Regions:
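Glycine/threonine-rich flexible loop motifs
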Residues: 42-53
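Class I S-adenosyl-L-methionine
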Residues: 78-121
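Short, well-ordered alpha-helix to beta-strand connector turns
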Residues: 12-13, 31, 64, 71, ...
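A short glycine-rich, Lys/Arg-flanked "PGG" loop and its adjoining helix->strand segment in the class I
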Residues: 51-70
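S-adenosyl-L-methionine
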Residues: 2-41
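Eukaryotic intrinsically disordered and solvent-exposed regulatory patches
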Residues: 1, 61, 100-103
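Short catalytic-loop micro-motif centered on adjacent basic/acidic residues
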Residues: 73-77
Length: 121
């Protein structure tokens, strides 16, 4: 687990309290799944929020490329619109299957959704 904020200890989970941009500085083994619920601070300006989300997704994709095992899965939060199109385009050559997920707990008016990459190539 990686977070800039402290986290309660969880059995069998290695936790690194670092900025996401610094994850390449730590020594990690390859993992079977990468989960991300990260999102930028929302400004309320769609274009700015979308660009900020794309910047975070670029970092996440580099983590997937470096640390996710072949055959692994990647689940991440994104916003419908430009950032989702960007993400799907980035993932289509990295995974055999890509699914969009809108959790029941997410408000219908929210642009928040999740993208699941299945079976990393």
């Amino acid at each position: 687990a990686i977070d800039i904020m402290p986290m309660k200890e969880i059995k069998n989970v290695n936790f690194f309290q670092i900025d996401l941009k610094d994850v390449h500085k730590i020594n990690l083994n390859k993992v079977s799944i990468v989960l991300s619920d990260i999102a930028p601070n929302i400004s309320g300006v769609s274009l700015i929020d979308s660009e900020n989300m794309k910047s975070l997704l670029e970092i996440e994709i580099s983590i997937v490329d470096k640390f996710l095992k072949i055959g692994g899965k990647y689940l991440c939060k994104c916003f419908e619109g430009d950032s989702m199109i960007f993400l799907k385009n980035e993932l289509k050559n990295r995974f055999r299957k890509i699914k969009r997920i809108k959790p029941d707990a997410s408000r219908s008016t929210s642009k928040e959704c999740y993208i699941l990459g299945i079976d990393k190539i």
